[in-house]
Amino acid sequence: NEEIYAYEDFEDESLLSKDLGINIFLEQTIYKQVKDNNLESDLKKLIIKIDKCLTSTNGALNFKSLGFKKYEGVGNNKIYGFDFNNKVNDSDRIIACFVDDYAKKNEFDFERYNNSQNKDKQGIILFSITKHNDQEREAQKVSKRINNSFYEHNQFKYVNEKKSKNIEIISVVNKNTQENNMTFRSLDFDDKQIIYQEVLTKEQSEQIHTFIQKSEPFILSGIAGSGKTISTVKLIPDMVEKIKNMGSDSKILYVTFSNNLKQYVKEKVIESYYEFNEYIDIKTFEDICTELNYKYNNKKIDRSRIITQNTYKKNFTKFLNYLHQTSRDGNILKFIKKYQKEKNIIYSEIFGILKGSMYVDWDREEKDIVKSEYYINDSNKIVEDYKIFAEEDREILYSITQKYNQWLVENEYYDINDIAFELQSLIKDKNINYEYVVVDEVQDFTEVQIYMLFLLAKEQEIYGKNKTRKILLAGDPNQIINPTFFKVGRLRKLFYLHGYNYEDKRLNENFRNSINIMKMNNIVNKIINDKLPARKEEDRQYEITKNNKTGIVEQVKASDENLKVIFTQINASAKVALIVSDDEKKEYLKEKYGCENAFTISEFKGKEFDNIIVYNILSDYADIYEEVYKKESLKEGHYSYYFNRFYVSITRANYNLVLIEEKETEILKEIKEKLGDNLRYIENIDTFKDLNLGELIGDSSELFNIGMKFFYDEEYAQAKNYFTRSVEPNSNNLAKICDLFEQEGKYDEKGDELFHIGEYKLAQTYYEKAYNFEKYAIMYLYMNNLSYEKQLREFYKCLDKQGINFSDLFDNYGYRFDKLHNILKNKIKKTNKLSSNIGLKIKNVNQLLGDINKKMNGR
């Protein structure tokens, strides 16, 4: 959400953006142009010139010197143009407007980015860079996009002092590619770097401001694409300022279940909030569980043996196969057979209820499994909404869970719920806490896991009277596809039981999905509300789109000919993904059609593509939906799980969505009826292009970036598929090692493989899993995205945190890692000189430097 780019030296380099009389904002189009063409230094020069024109008393220094021209805009907008002499083209133009003239200025919190005491700064929005001869058309496009409408029958005038002429309207050839949503980045700079920060909407800004001001538990619910992660990351400077003002040495914990999301947040903090980095720990839930066990119990849990909601499919299938082979209990075998095609229902009950729930009053004391009498009998200790099985089935499930616990011990596996439950006592006994705890994608967590994180937030008095914990939990109940049984109401109950005041806010603005997909989202939500009336009010939602793209929603007839065209030709595209219901369907398509671009819903959660094809997500569970439509009254139970799977699938699409369903289910009929003309039906296609999805191929860098996302989430087969089609540096090397990485464990070896091919950030994540913190620290010295000063600072901080002696480190790794030699040989003086700047917290820094000198002399 904030990015930093170094730029070359140029005139007026001593000026800081905070000293200027203007605030600059970049719309996403020009941001991409500047970034792709390395135009940071040219842009800064223009900004300084604009500032001088606005603030100078010199009559010769005015906007005319910048080729300033005014266009007659649309509605309340006034559109301007500036000359933009740059290294790519010295006759380009920038299309812009003043914030005060921007028709939708009240929708964005532009004021938040005024980093000066001068609150009267003018704000300027830069929209795009265009060729001189195309400026009128580009200004017209910008005006249309600002007003979110099309003007085929109007005329657009270009005006300056010398001439006035009418420009014929350019018809919109393809609305799907011409329309675009608008998001903005503020621009700040000093003499070393440029920082881009995403501008929050007023809605997002108001919600996070509430959390900072009230310092109370905060529930931030938000629909898919509403900017929940953006909002939580933006809190970091405010939280750090609060900690500093208190004179506290406490820290912030930012936790998620996704490795990919963890890496995204971590990079943003290092790049944009580096000065706050020492105040925040960014972890996956698995990270924090293993770290606490290692630090306080001196226990290294093999992370390849931990079963989580992200990894349960493979390991739980092993258990069910074992049970099928060894059990002589006919009731158990019959029950397993009954749910053979829906193993997730069995696992959900075990993981989310029998092992993952905390009872109605959040007071569970039994480890490994809830009390049998509470679960089997009709006890009020279990949340009513969680009771979806009959009593005889609950007896069988309880017995299966007991056998599962035994299987875990015998095979040296760990259930993440069991680890979290045991850590609750450790956290209380050792008084382990953070000043702030931020939980992203909270719907992915069970109650046991949430309660552990709740305990990590320090309980404290606020305003000298009420006790509280500063914990923010952000998520979306409609995206529960992991077996957690998450309910927002359960969080409210937790806070109520502790006597805490709390805030509960919601984000309903959708920035991801195009207009027609958003319409479909609302139709699906309305159907869920109608069919599951017991659904809690917090799960009911109506989405408001902030994406101006119309997009398309299509249904393609599921004929053999159409399926063959789609599944054999989809591999060539980096901009289209196919989502299927489970691994069996994915393997079937791969075997029959050679289809490599198919993903399960779980694999694709947290990711997005411009174009999504959804195949048989409704048809594969037709019997479930038929049951929903036949019954008059239903508990939400596991039914919401199937609706959520469909909702998550369709919301992965940024612009265009294609439905392929072999069965005409009642829910599909209702969706089609309510979409009406917004759904296009395609009877036959001859080529993949007949889907009319626009640009399909993408480029090599897109393929590589998608591959990296899957690699971070340890989806190696999917990562390999994209690496093999990319020609970016290291694509081939990464593709080669994907097969090796499918093996369990061996994290240290995997880290070495990644180090060998120069993937240092990736290598660091595997060294962390291997508990090899020496190599973990060394990786900082290889990260080119960090300045040398920052490399040293992170390196030494890690040594200090882990109690690693530099002398021992050099003896063990000096000959292998050349960067250690650099410290000793070439950079010892600079290290000494920078020691105060990098804020070394190592005891006896002078002794450390003395040891380095001795070793250098000895070499």
Regions picked out by a protein language model, each given a short descriptive name:
Residues 1-93, 99-177, 520:
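Basic, Lys/Arg-enriched alpha-helical interface segments
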Residues 105-107, 278, 301-414:
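Coupling/switch/interface segments within P-loop NTPase motor domains and analogous charged loops
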Residues 196-216, 419:
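N-terminal pre-P-loop "Q-motif" helix
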Residues 198-201, 221-238, 246-250, 257-263, ...:
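Conserved helicase motor core of SF1/SF2 NTP-dependent helicases
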Residues 709, 738-740, 753, 765-766, ...:
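Residue-level signature for tetratricopeptide repeat
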Residues 854-859:
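Non-Sec secretion/translocation targeting segments of pathogen effectors
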